[in-house]
Amino acid sequence: MLSRTLRWLILAMVSALPAAAQTFELGSMEPRRTLSVGVLYAHDSWDEYWEGTLKRSNGNIGTLTTQSVTMMTGYAVTDRLGLIAALPYVWTRASQGVLHEMSGFQDLAFGAKFRLLSSRPGRLGTFGASIAAVAALPTTDYTPDFYPLSIGTAGRRAAGHLALDFRSNTAWFANASASYMWCSNVRLNRSSYYTDGQMYLTNEVVMPNVVNYTLNTGVELGRLRIPVSLVQQRTLGGGDIRRQDAPFVSNRMDFVKLGGGLMYELPKNLSVSLGAARILTGRNVGQSTTFTSGLAYALHL
């Protein structure tokens, strides 16, 4: 059986790279005492980005490529409560210019989800609701002050999620979720910085919080599952990239992303996944295309 616990993280990566576990498929739970492990590879690249609302290319960057390998695990404590953890190793590279590549372990994400309710099977199908809480902590002292090559924000994050789901009596499923993510302040290795039209004589940067809205739908045909997702991210604050300047860690980063994938169950509790996603529109982000592939194994203890 394809691990439902690891579906959360697979869909999270397809929807919102490179941050682990920002969005989840919350509509199903793994049977109690099921341990899941998996690995996910992601390749994300862009050669155009939005400088505020101005879309442009940059000869000092060329094509910016971010790759990651994420180790994931999940455990179903009960039929209604599941735990997850994920740790990505990330490396970035610009094809032009003098900016050097960066690499390292990013943030350890861990959390839990709880199934609030599940309706009895009806004429159309079943309805349900779930909640989740996730936290992420940096595992290394990587710098957040080298965007767009920094591998992360180097800050602590915590998020709450709420999802409603529907599974038809045929092969169709859908769910909608919303999340709110709190972001801690981050510190730079310098005594001052300039952003959003102001000079700050401190090394501490106030980070804006983030909200995400996700729609997932698709079909499940025997061992094959085909999901499609639409994700909107809105940053609650932050300034735009200054004209002809580098991005900054606290910039407003908004986008709408369309993604899809294939998940197939193999014998012996193995499953494989392939995914792709494209940013349709954004602000202070690259118009990236993302490809993912994953392998998962589920064991009932």
Where are the predicted features?
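Outer-membrane pore/translocation modules
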Residues: 98-205, 250
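Transmembrane beta-strand segments of Gram-negative outer membrane beta-barrel proteins
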Residues: 28-47, 129-135
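Surface-exposed strand-loop-strand hairpins of Gram-negative outer-membrane beta-barrel proteins
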Residues: 43-68, 144-150
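Transmembrane beta-strands of outer-membrane beta-barrel pores
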Residues: 41-47, 87-93, 116, 135-141, ...
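Outer membrane beta-barrel transmembrane domains
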Residues: 48-59, 199-301
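Residues that define the transmembrane beta-barrel architecture of outer-membrane proteins
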Residues: 33, 65-69, 103-110, 127, ...
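Residues on the lipid-exposed face of transmembrane beta-strands in outer-membrane beta-barrel proteins
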Residues: 39-41, 71-75, 85, 110-116, ...
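Short loop/turn motifs that connect adjacent beta-strands in outer-membrane beta-barrel proteins
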Residues: 25-33, 80, 118-128, 170-172, ...
